[in-house]
Amino acid sequence: VKLSKSFANIPSLVDKLRAAGAKGVVLFNRSYQPDIDIDKVQMVAGDVFTSAGEISDTIRHAGIVSALVPGISIASSTGIHDGEAALKCLLAGAHVTQICTVLYKKGPQFVAEMIATIESWMQVKGYYSVSEFRGKLNAASVKSATMYERMQFMKYFANKDN
């Protein structure tokens, strides 16, 4: 089931989908993004492509859902533009990642570069299989799960070591 990030309680929704028989979820489906042309004073289509900066919500929810809803496969999507971003999603708990924008911008041959980045990182870290590190940094596995929780910006930085 492909989900939008506009739901209020994504872990609860994913758990209900799992209980109803869903085997997996995609976090996230990117919605149509409208824009306004202020010179022509009319609605126009916004950027159809994701940016690498959109990865944060994808990582956050993969980390939370993988910790709270065992037994469902998670595909991370949105903001994945390179091998490092794919690794972040896998470390957060995603089983797989999906890419689209980078294929349009760099072509299908870029997949080999992403795979090479992942394989190189795995070799340096001593991993032989993705299953060895999948979810290693999900909300249940990190010292401070507050990194995944919704919190005020200033509260986080007030407690951060400088």
Question: Language-model segments: what does each one mean?
Answer:
Residues 1-75, 81-97, 143-145, 149-162:
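Alpha/beta enzyme core
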Residues 32, 106, 140:
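The DNA-recognition helices of helix-turn-helix-type DNA-binding domains
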Residues 36-51, 104-127:
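C-terminal helical cap(s) of enzyme catalytic domains, especially alpha/beta-barrels
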Residues 96-106:
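Helical hairpin unit composed of two closely spaced alpha helices linked by a short loop
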Residues 80-82, 103-104:
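Short Gly/Pro-enriched loop/turn and capping motifs at secondary-structure junctions
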Residues 79-80, 136:
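Gly/Ser/Thr-rich helix-start
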Residues 110-162:
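Short hairpin/turn module used for nucleic-acid contact or packing/dimerization
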